[in-house]
Amino acid sequence: IHIDVDKCVDGCTACVDACNEENGLTGFGRPETDSQWIRKVKIQDNTTNKISTMPLMCQHCENPPCCDVCPTGASFKREDGIVMVNQHTCIGCRYCMMACPFKARSFVHETLTQQNTNAPRGKGCVESCNLCVNRIDHGAETTACEDACTKAGHNAITFGDLKDSSSKVSVVVSSNSPRRLRNDLNLQQKVFYSNI
């Protein structure tokens, strides 16, 4: 994923709303504990005082610390690089939540009803952005957040296959000199940001 922070609009929640709808994430009015697979954050450049807003989600690290600390292997990285949680083997210890430097994981505290059958979830499990695998595995080429951002007219999010040098996201990443968040951690994330 590539995110152009200059195109991300303060106050817009199109990407968050689309993710919530796609994955059946309904809040209980408790922002501190409600599941957030993607959230909008504000950052400030201390040298210029520029304040920007941007979406923050699982960074799909090449070297994911969440997988390293998981005692059951429930946190895992697929061959295509997508980092996921196996709801059947997650024991809810939340070590992965503590290990994630991006606070990109949520814990399901409540019993869930009326779930989206494409994205089953379970009480007592950890969860995070899975790059809409329910769509991608069935041939879709975009995520819900990208579609929503495009529909809103911002075009801040570009999704695709970073291993395909001719893909739209690869072209954007190679031409914009983007950076990774907390590059000092050497996690080799697959989410890139420009203009931050």
Predicted features and spans:
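Non-ligating segments of multi-cofactor redox enzymes
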Residues: I1-I196
